[in-house]
Amino acid sequence: MARKYYHATPFENLESIIDQGIHRGCDGVVYLTEKPEEAVRFVVIRGYVDILVCEVQVEEDMVEETFDHSEAFFKCRAYGYSEDIIPDEITSYIKYSRPVS
C-alpha cells in the first residue's frame, strides 16, 4: 500500500528532481520523514537557506526506519526508501526559506 512521506534537499535541486526524480544516496536509500517540517531539519542543519521538500507517495513495504540519525536530536524518526523515487511518485513540492541571521 502506498503512503505519503517527505524528503528535503537544497532548493537548487528542483530542476533535476522534476526531470529525474530523487536518487538514492551513497548509502543506498532515499531518506524520508513523516512530516514536511521534520524533513527540513535534516537540510537546515547543513546551512541551506532555501529548501525543497518533496511529498512522495511510495510503497510502504519498501520503507524501513533508519537508526543512523539521532531521534532525540532531530525530534523525529527517519526512514529509508530502498529505490530511486521516480517523478510520478512525487505528489507535491514545497519551498521553505529561513531568514539569514
Predicted segments with their positions:
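Short, flexible beta-strand-to-coil junctions
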Residues: 7-14, 34, 55-60
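ADP-ribose/NAD+-binding catalytic cleft of ART/PARP-like enzymes
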Residues: 1-28, 44
